[in-house]
């Protein structure tokens, strides 16, 4: 018998997707020049993608259902491929760009495909997802920063950086994570953690550290040549900060909320299509002379999405 879904997970996804959308409006809009906007963008970035990746791992289907498992992987890849190809046509991507550089927001779908395939292989090799594996993944993520060619190409750096969160979600599938957090973490401590994180975000914004924080918590580039060890330390620190802030967010804000629950159930669609919202507000350029192609792109991708299980 399939276990009853805890709707608080949908509330969490709804909260996260709204944070992601708001952050993208800040980052890609002109308001990012203001201290307040930078502060919010930095603060939100600390927990949104780590929690999204964790939730994706937490709800990853069991490999024992091989046909259904691969159908889910192909569904995610199909959605990724449709967007990548059509956006490539709209913006005149070269073949190399089309293959090697995921379009804005699409890197996550490519990462999901890779992580799910890796999990399938680990399962077939009888390798358990446990604390040792998570530690190894963190060490690998720290190490790849020293490799100059592992960066935004194929989103490899991000795939390595966020992998520990995905497999941590898989490892904790049999634990009622939300209940455990609410039981063990006291509300005053959770508020203190978030206040300290917010103060640090303000300081980073005031002292022009926005892009340093942004880069560290995205993990999308190799370490700067002259400061490799410093940035490795920052990357390790980012894992600790994201973990602590994330559980605090869950403790304080993940409760019953019908509106967020509704949004959370369609989080993948919001994630993929909010690019059109950015275009509508003039934050991202609209290829007007390819408008009809854009409409076909939107309709076809939506048709694909409606046929697939949600990846989030």
Language model features with spans:
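Alpha-helical transmembrane segments and their immediate juxtamembrane cytosolic regions
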Residues: 1-312
